[in-house]
C-alpha cells in the first residue's frame, strides 16, 4: 500500500485508528480558534489531493467551524405567541458543508472555492477544510488543469451551488425516476424538489 492509501484507510473509521486520538487533541485547540482559519497544510492530504489540491502557489486551505443541528434563527422583538415565533424547526435547505464553503468564500472574497471535505466533529460543531484557489494568480492561470476557474462563469460559484457539496444538496447527483423536479433547478420547479 502507498502512503495515501494508509491515510485513507485510517480516516475511514477515525475512532478505531490513531486518527481518533489526534482529533481529540486537535479539537480542544480548534474550539478556541475563530470560525474561519487559514491553515498551512491540509489535515487529510489524500482527500485534498483527490479533490484537486496541489502544493503550489495560488492554492489556499481554510478550516471552517459550523454549528451542528437546525438553523438558529434570530428572536423576534415584537409580541406574539411563542408558538408563532418561527424560531425552531426551520432547517436550512443546505448541507452544513455547503454553509462552511460559503463562510470561507465570504472571508476570502478574492478566492474561489474549489472543493471541501470533513475533518472532524463533536457534539456542537463540525469542521470542514475548504480548498480555495486564487483565480488571478499567474501560476493558476498557466496551469491547464485549473485555469478554467479564472473564467467569468465561475465567479462566486459557491453561492450558486456549483461546488460538489452544492450540487449534492440541490439533488443533482440523482437522475431518472424520482429526480423529475431537480432540473433545471429547485426554483424553476417552485421548491418541489425539497
From Swiss-Prot:
Region (Disordered): 162-194
Keyword set, alphabetical order: Ribonucleoprotein, Ribosomal protein
GO MF annotation list: RNA binding; structural constituent of ribosome
UniProt keyword Ribosomal protein present: yes
Compositional bias annotation for Basic residues: 167-176
InterPro entries per UniProt: Rbsml_eL15_core_dom_sf (IPR024794), Ribosomal_eL15 (IPR000439), Ribosomal_eL15_arc (IPR020926), Ribosomal_eL15_CS (IPR020925), Ribosomal_uL23/eL15/eS24_sf (IPR012678)
A Gene Ontology term for the protein's cellular component: cytosolic large ribosomal subunit
GO biological process: cytoplasmic translation
Signal peptide as annotated in the record: none
PANTHER family: LARGE RIBOSOMAL SUBUNIT PROTEIN EL15, RIBOSOMAL PROTEIN L15
NCBIfam families named in the record: PRK04243.1 (NF003269)
Family: Belongs to the eukaryotic ribosomal protein eL15 family.
Protein name (record): Large ribosomal subunit protein eL15
Organism of this sequence: Thermococcus onnurineus (strain NA1)
Gene designation per UniProt: rpl15e
Amino acid at each position: 500500500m502507498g502512503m495515501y492509501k494508509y491515510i485513507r484507510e485510517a480516516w475511514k473509521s477515525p475512532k478505531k485508528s490513531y486518527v481518533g486520538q489526534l482529533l481529540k487533541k486537535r479539537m480542544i485547540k480548534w474550539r478556541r480558534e475563530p470560525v474561519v482559519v487559514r491553515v498551512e497544510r491540509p489535515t487529510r492530504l489524500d482527500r485534498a489531493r483527490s479533490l484537486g489540491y496541489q502544493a503550489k502557489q495560488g492554492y489556499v486551505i481554510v478550516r471552517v467551524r459550523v454549528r451542528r443541528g437546525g438553523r438558529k434563527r434570530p428572536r423576534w422583538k415584537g409580541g406574539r405567541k411563542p408558538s408563532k415565533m418561527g424560531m425552531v424547526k426551520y432547517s436550512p435547505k443546505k448541507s452544513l458543508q455547503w454553509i462552511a464553503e460559503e463562510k470561507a468564500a465570504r472571508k476570502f472574497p478574492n478566492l474561489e472555492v474549489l472543493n471541501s471535505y470533513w475533518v472532524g466533529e463533536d457534539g456542537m460543531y463540525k469542521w470542514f477544510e475548504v480548498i480555495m484557489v486564487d483565480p488571478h494568480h499567474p501560476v493558476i492561470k498557466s496551469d491547464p488543469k485549473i485555469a478554467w476557474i479564472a473564467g467569468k462563469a465561475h465567479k462566486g460559484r459557491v453561492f450558486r451551488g456549483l461546488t460538489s457539496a452544492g450540487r449534492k444538496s440541490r439533488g443533482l447527483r440523482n437522475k431518472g425516476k424520482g429526480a423529475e423536479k431537480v432540473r433545471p433547478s429547485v426554483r424553476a420547479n417552485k421548491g418541489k424538489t425539497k
